[in-house]
Every structure is written in structure tokens, then in C-alpha cells.
From Swiss-Prot:
NCBIfam families in the record: gcp_kae1, T6A_TsaD_YgjD
EC supergroup of this enzyme: transferase
An example molecular function term from Gene Ontology annotations: N(6)-L-threonylcarbamoyladenine synthase activity
Gene behind the chain: tsaD
Cofactor(s) this protein cannot do without: Fe(2+)
Binding site for substrate: 134-138, 167, 180, 270
Family: Belongs to the KAE1 / TsaD family.
Enzyme Commission (EC) number: 2.3.1.234
Protein's GO biological process: tRNA threonylcarbamoyladenosine modification
Residues binding Fe cation, per UniProt: 111, 115, 298
Name of the protein in its database record: tRNA N6-adenosine threonylcarbamoyltransferase
InterPro entries, per database record: ATPase_NBD (IPR043129), Gcp-like_dom (IPR000905), KAE1/TsaD (IPR017861), Peptidase_M22_CS (IPR017860), TsaD (IPR022450)
SUPFAM superfamilies per UniProt: Actin-like ATPase domain
Species in which this protein is naturally found: Nitrosococcus oceani (strain ATCC 19707 / BCRC 17464 / JCM 30415 / NCIMB 11848 / C-107)
Entry-linked PANTHER family: TRNA N6-ADENOSINE THREONYLCARBAMOYLTRANSFERASE (PTHR11735), TRNA N6-ADENOSINE THREONYLCARBAMOYLTRANSFERASE, MITOCHONDRIAL (PTHR11735:SF6)
């Protein structure tokens, strides 16, 4: 089965073609980072309009890259949520319309299921069951995965997602947008011993997270020490986040008895986190899996892949369509 994937949940326009027998045939991503940089964050209306401008040309380009005509597509997968409503509607409208015109099935894909399954696109994919840490600008959660759709949420953020905390702290340090990668780069220059930030919620049982207090702690430290301390603040902030995520992952693995950990979402590209989780994996005899760096961010390949699995199982979305700003991951049907 050849599935066309469309991702428009936020500020990236991603399109891809996945073949259930041949694998990923083509993948193209357009980033809106420059468009939003002057505003310090994503402007939803601008994001929607840019998706409208870019999506159809990208679809033609990805089909050409795959060596296919639109009639060669067996199904269409589009992100149905969670995300920005206006941005989601662009991808959903185009995806549903194309599927209807071709007489092919369409499926609305959960954005975070796309991230969750993205390591399965790699040459050495994890087997089921596994524990997953999903970390992005909008989500932070620990999940057990017994098979596709069989998800149990072990813990999640009670306030800011980890990617959001990175971006907000980067904005305090005047690092521009997108802030997460800029903060990580600045942290490499920081003194790890100058400041110590608290490790939130490690002093209590459970696997939930809280990151909003770290942003406030960074702001207070900046006010006391001035901008010359920016690199040291970035280092202290990142160390606190990495320690917290690592400890929670270890707890989740010990509680579940699983020996495979998937880490996915935009923040999974953070190299300091990867180094710590690698060390933890060695200590705990746990194999840690990631998507390739290009698939850590939002992309069409993960949507095409996840959609293909559900279409092959006989699932499809009804002829009408709706999108969701919020969509609990553990409400998805098992396949």
C-alpha cells in the first residue's frame, strides 16, 4: 500500500510517500522558522496561510520525487490533531479532498502517534512492547506501548511541555526563535558548576512532570546575575531538564519491567539528553531508540507511516472531517 502523508499541525509543512513493501519513497519538509522568527514564536494565522501557499506545490514535488502519479496513491493520511486548528484544517481539507477525488481511503492520524512510531522507520526498529518518552513543544509524556494503539499514559507534564520550557527560557535569554536548539548550543559554553537549578517533582513518587518553575528560576537567576551569565543559566537549565527526564525514564522502566525505551519528538534531538539516556541505558541494560534527527521534528514521513499501519488494518476516517486541538493519545483504537 502506498500512502501519501500530510503534516500541518504547527509550523512545518511536511509531505511524504510511504510504501508498505518498499518503505519510505519520498519525504519533503518546509519549515516556517524564518517566517515566525521576528515574532518570537508561532503566529497561528501566519502558519495557516503559509501551509495554504506551500502544500499543493509540495505535494506535486513529493509525488515527482517518488516517481508516482497521484493515481498511484492507495490512501491519504493527514494529521487530525492535536495542534493549531487553522493549520490542521489546511492539511485535513487538502487530504480529504484528494482522497475523495481519487476514490481512495483517508485517515486522520494523531500527531503524537506519528512521533511515537517514527523510530519504526529506522533500519533497526524497536519491537513491542516498549516504554516511550514523547517530548515536544506541546507534549511531555511517558507511555507504555504494547502494540499500535495499545497505549497507557504513565505520566505527563502538569504545566509546560519540555519543549515549551526550552523555548520560553531561550526567549528570556534573548536567543531568538526557535529557541530550544539555540539554548542547547549556548549551554555547551556554560559552566556546569556555577548554578544549580531544582529538579522538579523528583522528590515525590509518580511519573508526572512540571517544568514551568524552571523557567521562573531561570528568570530570577538572570535578574540577579545579568546577561553575562546567560551561558551558565542555559547550562543549569538544560542539566535540570536532562536529569529530570532521565530519572523519570529510569523509574518508568523499573516500574514496567520493560527493557526498550523509545524517545521521540522535537526535544529528542537534544544531544545532552541522548548522552545521559545512553549512559542510563547501559547501566539498566536498556536499549534506547530514536528517530533519525530529520524525523525528530514534525514531518510527513511519520504521518504517512502511522496512517499506513491503520489503513492496512482496515481503519479509515468517515467522509466528513474534523480536527482537534486536543486529542488524548490513550483514546486511540488498538490495531
Amino acid at each position: 500500500m502506498r500512502v501519501l502523508g500530510i503534516e500541518t499541525s504547527c509550523d512545518e509543512t511536511g509531505v511524504a510517500v510511504f510504501d508498505s513493501k518498499q518503505g519510505l519513497l519520498a519525504d519533503i519538509l518546509h519549515s516556517q522558522a524564518k517566517l515566525h522568527a521576528g515574532y518570537g514564536g508561532v503566529v497561528p494565522e501566519l502558519a495557516s496561510r503559509d501551509h495554504i501557499r506551500k502544500l499543493l506545490p509540495l505535494l506535486r514535488k513529493v509525488l515527482n520525487q517518488a516517481g508516482l502519479n497521484k493515481e498511484d496513491i492507495d490512501g491519504v493520511a493527514y494529521t487530525g490533531g492535536p495542534g493549531l486548528i487553522g493549520a490542521l484544517l489546511v492539511g485535513a481539507a487538502v487530504g480529504r479532498s484528494l482522497a475523495w477525488a481519487l476514490g481512495k481511503p483517508a485517515i486522520a492520524v494523531h500527531h503524537m502517534e506519528g512521533h511515537l512510531l517514527s523510530p519504526l522507520l529506522e533500519p533497526n526498529p524497536p519491537g513491542f512492547p516498549f516504554c516511550a518518552l514523547l517530548i515536544s513543544g506541546g507534549h511531555t509524556m511517558l507511555v507504555t506501548v504494547n502494540r499500535i494503539g495499545a497505549y497507557r499514559i504513565l505520566g505527563e507534564s502538569l504545566d509546560d511541555a519540555v519543549g515549551e520550557a526550552f523555548d520560553k527560557t531561550a526567549k528570556l535569554l534573548q536567543l531568538g526563535y526557535p529557541g530550544g536548539p539555540a539554548l542547547a548550543k549556548l549551554a555547551e559554553q556554560g559552566n556546569p558548576d556555577r548554578f544549580y537549578f531544582p529538579r522538579p517533582m523528583l522528590d515525590r513518587p509518580g511519573l508526572n512532570f512540571s517544568f514551568s518553575g524552571l523557567k521562573t528560576y531561570a528568570l530570577n537567576t538572570l535578574h540577579k546575575n545579568g546577561s553575562e551569565a546567560a551561558a551558565d543559566i542555559a547550562r543549569a537549565f538544560q542539566d535540570a531538564v536532562v536529569d529530570t527526564l532521565t530519572v523519570k525514564c529510569r523509574r518508568a522502566l523499573q516500574q514496567t519491567g520493560l527493557n526498550r525505551l523509545v524517545v521521540a519528538g522535537g526535544v529528542s534531538a537534544n544531544q545532552a539528553l541522548r548522552q545521559r539516556l545512553k549512559a542510563m541505558g547501559t547501566q539498566e541494560n536498556v536499549q534506547v531508540y530514536y528517530p533519525r534527527l530529520a524525523f525528530c521534528t514534525d514531518n510527513g514521513a511519520m504521518i504517512a507511516f502511522a496512517g499506513c499501519q491503520r489503513l492496512l488494518a482496515g481503519e479509515q476516517t468517515s467522509s466528513g472531517f474534523s480536527v482537534r486541538a486536543r486529542w488524548p493519545l490513550d483514546t486511540l483504537p488498538e490495531i
